[in-house]
């Protein structure tokens, strides 16, 4: 591969443009730098910025099909070969506090042995781990190592999010055992997050597996083995997602059953109350007709005796219900 001049990839509004020093560190890219396989360049762009969009549309360093892919609409994770270069689309967890985590962030990467061009619109938090390692001098030394570290960081964030969802499901199951129903929409959001994760992480696992099996010239055998380990780890996370989705289905049925039982219990209670007070209601209505005068209306103890009879009647009905095991 021919060397690239630093001025050819130095975009003014880039998120950052760095050169890997081959020892685990980076330095800012300068126009006089020479980019080759020993000192590759990482150019990270926000494709909605004007200068970045113009560079993506005009640079001769990228194949025509790659230009549109790096600045196009979000797609599912995939990997495509373009001659000596490789286009990779990945998804990562959105950890921003003002947005929902199920809205995964897309990151697109085109790379060969000399150049790494990554684009995004929303911030990719998983890249902070790789950036931190590079700034400390403990990061990747070449393009293959960079890709493995990025995929590892993305998988770490995905695994943490899956674990958080799993913990929520455990808490929800414990609450259901205590007959505590979650707030309206809680289970639906949890299930949606799991389904969205399943939708994007399954093809991303396939991307990792393909990168591990492809004989890319800028990846060593050790890096391919690490990539396969990452694919296997994400596969275990997908198994956990499948189990969680099944458990949410069971919990939805359990919640419906608990709500039905609560409704039946309340209806039963109201029916018993109506049965207890039905005789007393009949008597008070009968005495209140007042067609032939109220019985005992002229006796000073008439009302007291009537109240005592009502209490005895209600007690008798309640006792009968109790002995009949309705109460």
Curated annotation (Swiss-Prot):
Transmembrane segments: 274-294, 301-321
Main localization of the protein described in the UniProt heading: membrane
Membrane topology according to the record: Multi-pass membrane protein
Catalytic activity: Zn(2+)(out) + H(+)(out) = Zn(2+)(in) + H(+)(in)
Residue numbers on the Periplasmic membrane side: 295-300
Compartment annotation: Cell inner membrane
Keyword Transcription assigned: no
SUPFAM superfamilies: CorA soluble domain-like, Magnesium transport protein CorA, transmembrane region
InterPro entries: CorA_cytoplasmic_dom (IPR045861), CorA_TM1_TM2 (IPR045863), MgTranspt_CorA/ZnTranspt_ZntB (IPR002523), Zn_transp_ZntB (IPR023714)
Annotated GO CC locations: plasma membrane
A Pfam short name: CorA
Keywords: Cell inner membrane, Cell membrane, Ion transport, Membrane, Transmembrane, Transmembrane helix, Transport, Zinc
Domain of life: Bacteria
GO molecular function: cobalt ion binding; cobalt ion transmembrane transporter activity; magnesium ion binding; magnesium ion transmembrane transporter activity; zinc ion transmembrane transporter activity
Cytoplasmic side: 1-273, 322-327
Physiological role: Zinc transporter. Acts as a Zn(2+):proton symporter, which likely mediates zinc ion uptake.
HAMAP family xrefs: ZntB (MF_01565)
Family statement: Belongs to the CorA metal ion transporter (MIT) (TC 1.A.35) family.
Record protein name field: Zinc transport protein ZntB
Lineage, top ranks: Bacteria, Pseudomonadati, Pseudomonadota, Gammaproteobacteria, Enterobacterales
């Amino acid at each position: 591969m021919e060397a690239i001049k630093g001025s050819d990839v130095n975009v003014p509004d880039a998120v950052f443009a760095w050169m890997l020093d081959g020892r685990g560190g980076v330095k800012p890219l300068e126009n006089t730098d020479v980019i080759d396989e020993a000192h590759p360049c990482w150019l990270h762009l926000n494709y909605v910025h004007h200068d970045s969009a113009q560079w993506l549309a005009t640079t001769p360093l990228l194949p025509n099909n790659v230009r549109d892919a790096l600045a196009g609409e979000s797609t599912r994770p995939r990997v495509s070969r373009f001659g000596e270069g490789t286009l990779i689309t990945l998804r990562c967890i959105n950890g921003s506090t003002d947005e929902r985590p199920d809205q995964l962030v897309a990151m697109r990467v085109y790379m060969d042995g000399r150049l790494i061009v990554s684009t995004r619109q929303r911030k990719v938090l998983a890249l902070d781990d790789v950036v931190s390692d590079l700034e400390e001098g403990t990061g990747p030394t070449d393009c293959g190592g960079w890709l493995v570290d990025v995929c590892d960081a993305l998988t770490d964030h995905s695994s943490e999010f899956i674990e958080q969802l799993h913990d929520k499901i455990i808490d929800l199951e414990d609450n259901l055992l205590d007959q505590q129903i979650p707030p309206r929409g809680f289970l639906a959001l949890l299930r949606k997050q799991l389904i969205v994760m399943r939708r994007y992480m399954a093809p991303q696992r396939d991307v990792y597996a393909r990168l591990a099996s492809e004989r890319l010239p800028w990846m060593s055998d050790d890096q391919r083995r690490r990539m396969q380990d990452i694919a296997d780890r994400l596969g275990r996370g997908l198994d956990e997602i499948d189990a969680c989705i099944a458990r949410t289905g069971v919990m939805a049925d359990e919640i419906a059953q608990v709500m039905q039982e609560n409704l039946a219990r309340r209806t039963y209670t109201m029916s018993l109350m109506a049965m207890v007070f039905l005789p007393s209601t009949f008597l008070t209505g009968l005495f209140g007709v007042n067609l032939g005068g109220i019985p005992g209306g002229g006796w000073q103890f008439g009302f007291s005796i009537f109240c005592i009879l009502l209490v005895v009647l209600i007690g008798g009905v309640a006792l009968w219900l109790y002995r009949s095991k309705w109460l």
